UniProtKB/Swiss-Prot annotation:
GO biological process: defense response to bacterium
Keywords, sorted A to Z: Amidation, Amphibian defense peptide, Antibiotic, Antimicrobial, Secreted
Leader peptide range in chain numbering: none
Organism listed in the record: Rana latastei
Protein name: Temporin-1LTa
Organism superkingdom: Eukaryota
Known function: Antimicrobial peptide.
Expressed in which tissues: Expressed by the skin glands.
Main location: secreted
Length: 14
């Protein structure tokens, strides 16, 4: 667990 959270954070940063 972690990759999904990172992906979500990246999407939010966009």
């Amino acid at each position: 667990l972690g990759a999904l959270t990172q992906l979500l954070l990246n999407l939010g940063k966009l």
